[in-house]
Structure formats: C-alpha cells, structure tokens
Amino acid sequence: MNQKMESMAEEHPDATIDLRGVKCPFNFVKTKLKLEAMESGETLSVILDPGEPIANVPRSVQEEGHALLGVTERPDGLFEILVKKA
C-alpha cells in the first residue's frame, strides 16, 4: 500500500492525529472522534502503524463516507493518510 497522491503534498491538513502504537479498533475510534469534532470539508492527517492499522483505518473512514485523499509510507516505516471530512 505504498500509494502517494499529489494532493497529499499540496494539501495542508487542518488537523493531525498521531496514532502510532494505538491498536485496532482504538485507532479508528480515535480517528472517528477527531473527524466528528471537525467541520465538513476539513482535512485530517492520521499517522498509523503498518499492518492492521493501515489496512483497516482507511477502509473504515471511507465506509463512514469520508474521502481518502492519499496514503503515504514514510521513511520511518509509519504511514500517513489524509482524510477529507464528509
């Protein structure tokens, strides 16, 4: 899942949440709560561990109706996703 979209480089997120070390399903719950506190159209950067978190959180936010703008694997082995709130 090493997909990088141009929009991530150009996009400056309205908020960032660092969820390294947070296990499933708590990483999605924390992401969902953060998105609920944001305005429609705002963007959220989420830092996730490899494995289950990067497999599950992007899918779950899309199932909630939000837009996944990009996924980037960082040099430190973590992943960053950019989500636009519905």
Tell me what each language-model feature is:
Residues 2-20, 62-69, 74-78, 82-86:
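Long, charged, low-complexity intrinsically disordered regions
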Residues 19-73:
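Amphipathic, hydrophobic secondary-structure cores in small proteins
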